Each structure stands twice: as C-alpha cells, then as structure tokens.
C-alpha cells in the first residue's frame, strides 16, 4: 500500500484540482473516509495498490515521454472539471452542506409520506369519533350515520385543500407569465 498520511479521517492532498475539489465536498469526503475505514474498503485499496505497484509502476518510465505530450490536455481537462464543479456548487449549494444535515433532511423527506399518512388516519378517526358522539347511540344506524358524515367532512376538506393548491399554483403561473411578458 502506498504511504499516504491519514490522520483522523483526513485525506491526503491529490495532484488534480478536480479530484481535490470533489474531496472537498462533505458527502464525498465522508464517503471516501468511510470506505477507507471499512475492512472491505481497506482490502480493496490494498489489492488496487498492489496491482498498481506490480503492473503500472514499472511502466511509468516508458510513459514519461507520451505523458509530456498529453500533460497540457490533461491539465486543461482538470481545470475545466474544477470550473464545472465550481459552477455546480453555485447552482446547487446544498452539496456543500455537512453530511449529517443532508442525512437528516433526506430522512425527513422519506418519512414525510408515512408521517402524513398517520396524521390523516388520526384525523379521520378523530372526526369519526366526534361524529359518532354527535349522533349518539350505539347501534348500526348511528355508526352508519357517523361514517357518512365523516366521509362528507373529509371529502369537503380534501376539496378545499385541492382548491387552495390550485389557486396558489394559478397565482404562481400568473406571476411567471407576467414576468416573461414584461421582460
């Protein structure tokens, strides 16, 4: 394995601006550190380094001359990659957030449908209990009335919510059209 200094998960500097830029992104950095600390990752790195030392390192002196011709193109490609990553960071600033923050956000987004489903279920059962209490009695007819009134109430709430969403989107579309027309 090549001698690369690693202290507390810090990664050694690399010769490529693009690769270094990628390693400066918290999610990628943490992924590389996790891979290096994983036993399978360590073994993969050891095998890869061994293959490099056995097969590629002896050929490097023979590739020095062709590399001299290719170096300006590789440096230009590296600079373009670095510039592209800078532009991506400007357009998508979320990639510079710490990994824990991204993980918590993703966890919240994934749990949203489940949480919303449970809240909706609780709301329907609460509405049913209120309607059953209003109707009074403990027989099949009162349960049926409570179910029908719960269905009507829930349906009207959904229709109101859809109307609010459509109104908001309509106003948003108007603003976009006005902005496009005025520019």
From Swiss-Prot:
It comes from the Eukaryota. Keywords: Lipid droplet, Virulence. It is found in: Lipid droplet. Disruption phenotype: Shows fewer lipid droplet numbers and leads to thinner spores and smaller appressoria. Results also in reduced turgor pressure generation and enlarged appressoria pore size. Drastically decreases virulence on avocado and tomato fruits, as well as on rubber tree leaves. Its main location: other. Lipid droplet coating protein that regulates lipid metabolism, appressorial turgor pressure, and virulence. Appressorial turgor pressure is important for the mechanical penetration of the host cuticle during infection. Belongs to the perilipin family. This is Lipid droplet coating protein Cap20.
């Amino acid at each position: 394995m090549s001698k690369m200094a690693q202290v507390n998960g810090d990664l050694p500097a690399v010769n490529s601006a693009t690769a270094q830029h990628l390693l400066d992104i918290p999610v990628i950095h943490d992924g590389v550190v996790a891979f290096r600390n994983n036993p399978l990752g360590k073994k993969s790195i050891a095998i890869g380094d061994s293959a490099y030392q056995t097969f590629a390192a002896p050929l490097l002196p023979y590739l020095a001359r062709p590399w001299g011709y290719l170096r300006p193109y590789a440096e230009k490609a590296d600079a373009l990659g670095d510039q592209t990553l800078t532009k991506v960071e400007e357009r998508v600033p979320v990639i510079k957030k710490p990994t824990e923050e991204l993980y918590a956000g993703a966890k919240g987004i994934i749990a949203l449908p489940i949480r919303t489903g449970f809240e909706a279920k609780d709301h329907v059962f609460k509405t049913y209990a209120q309607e059953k209490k209003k109707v009074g009695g403990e027989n099949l007819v009162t349960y049926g009335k409570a179910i029908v009134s719960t269905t009507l109430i829930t349906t009207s709430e959904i229709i109101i919510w859809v109307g609010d969403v459509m109104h908001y989107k309509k106003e948003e579309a108007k603003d976009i059209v006005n902005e496009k027309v005025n520019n």
